[in-house]
Design a protein with these regions (language model features):
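Polar low-complexity intrinsically disordered regions
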Residues: 1-3, 145, 283
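Long, contiguous, compositionally biased segments that the model treats as domain-scale units
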Residues: 1-127
Length: 292
């Protein structure tokens, strides 16, 4: 036996049966004996969570209806109908477009147990299709931005969260509001590098104590400025993410250059003071010796 989730067991049986057509929420499978089929069927029948998906009176083993789900040894063929789970994101999704319609995914929660039919991909598979990886990256970005936002606004009638960023300067403040989403068009955009945003999260600050607070402030200010100047929504921000990153890098470079110049001036002043003190002490010592 394995530690498969019920959904993973259903996916394994679906693949073993040759991935037949799915009729709505019902999946009819014809299975010939194989060690792999035997293991998966026993996982299905012995797990209370998995066996609930077996349609009653539609489990036939070697031509005989199986009433108690006690799969006999040495079976030859099985006909079984399953009712696929539909009550959460942990289900069979016909396409990646179906997956991203779930509000939890749009809010940055990448699911841990799901299957995309047209990609033949389950979330525990080793090889991740590019489209799925992009959804995962956008989810990571949404989560990171959510932690960097000054606050979340859920007062809208649709109940969807909006991330509010505030820029303060010269006693005045500006704000930018982003409503996270994932659209099918976004899957055609260039790969999104979300590392810089994740590094600025509070729980990552221990890894970079140098100017961490300043970097976070520069990022927020750049985001507000960039969104307002271009009147971008979240999708447009993702589309132009590389340009935004460049704007942030430029602003950060300006800050660091100013900081280094200020630090250099302080170092020079300190060195001059130290030299002056040492020179003064040397002169005083020499004068004392002469007078003595």
């Amino acid at each position: 036996m394995t530690n498969n989730t019920p959904l993973r067991t259903l996916v394994e049986l679906y693949r073993i049966a040759g991935k037949p057509a799915i009729s709505g929420v019902y999946l009819s499978l014809l299975l010939d004996y194989s060690p792999k089929a035997d293991v998966s069927l026993r996982e299905l029948t012995t797990s209370h969570r998995a066996s609930q998906y077996i349609v009653e009176d539609e489990f036939i083993v070697d031509g005989v209806f199986l009433q108690n789900y006690n799969l006999p040894m040495g079976w030859k063929n099985v006909s079984i109908t399953l009712k696929l789970p539909r009550d959460s994101v942990q289900r069979f999704h016909n396409t990646i477009a179906d997956l991203i319609t779930f509000s939890s995914v749009r809010n940055g929660e990448f699911p841990t147990d799901f299957y995309v039919v047209d990609l033949d991909y389950h979330s525990e598979d080793t090889t991740i299709p590019p489209a799925v990886q992009k959804v995962k990256n956008v989810c990571r970005l949404i989560k990171a931005l959510s932690k960097l936002a000054h606050y979340h606004d859920r007062k809208a009638t649709d109940g969807e969260p909006r991330l509010v960023f505030i820029q303060g300067s010269d006693g005045r403040s500006k704000s930018a509001i982003l409503q996270p989403t994932i659209t099918y068009e976004m899957l055609d955009y260039s790969d999104i590098d979300c590392n810089v945003v994740e590094q600025l999260q509070d729980d990552h600050s221990i890894n970079d104590v140098n100017h961490h607070i300043e970097k976070r402030g520069i990022f927020r200010n750049t985001l507000v400025e960039y969104i307002n100047e271009n009147s971008f929504n979240f999708q447009q921000l993702i589309e132009h993410w590389t340009d935004f990153r460049l704007a942030y890098d430029n602003n950060l470079s300006v800050y660091l250059s100013g900081f280094n110049f200020h630090k250099a001036r302080k170092d020079v002043a300190a060195a001059e003071l130290d030299f002056s003190e040492k020179t003064s002490k040397t002169i005083s010592d020499s004068t004392a010796k002469i007078l003595a």
